[in-house]
Amino acid sequence: MSSLSSPSTLYDAHGRPLEYLRLAVTDRCNLRCFYCMPEEGIKYMPKHELLSYEEMLRLVEIMTGLGVRKVRLTGGEPFVRRDLVPFMERLADIPGINDLSLTTNGVLTAPHVPTMARIGVKAVNLSLDTLDRQRFFDITRRDELPQVMRTFHALLDAGIQLKINAVVMDGRNIQDLAPLAELTRELPVEVRFI
């Protein structure tokens, strides 16, 4: 039997082993970025239709048996889901998972950074389109830049790898590209313009 047909490993269409799982824990978000969501919000999936944490843990256990080694939590905004941190602690304890990371807008994240560092969260992608408070408000419709920057500094202080995801928008934040890029000269931060 060829290794590509092994039932214990998943492969993509190019024959590469699949080792990475993105797990969306919610579709809800506490920001209203104009490029993502109308100001009044959207109709969310009913809570009873979301996978429970127990179901997600079981899914990850099955996926580790098929070769998955890295799990990234996403959303919406993962931290709007109740009890996310205890769930992350349980995920980190699953044998075979050697890379736990997440994508966040950073508004609710800072208080959880010490626990994230303790359980071995390796990396965080932080959505941050500007360092200017007024432009942040104009883009997200929320005045939360100070909270996001607390998360930014807490992650750096904790030694968690930090990558900034910045959506580039002509007429909205072009003037912020250089200041965001400058972060990479001064700090151990990667900035990705999308």
Regions found by a protein language model. Name each.
Residues 2-99:
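Conserved alpha-helical substructure of the radical SAM core
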Residues 26, 38-39, 127-131, 194:
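Generic beta-structure capping elements
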Residues 53, 57-72, 80-182, 190-192:
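Radical SAM/AdoMet-radical enzyme domain recognition
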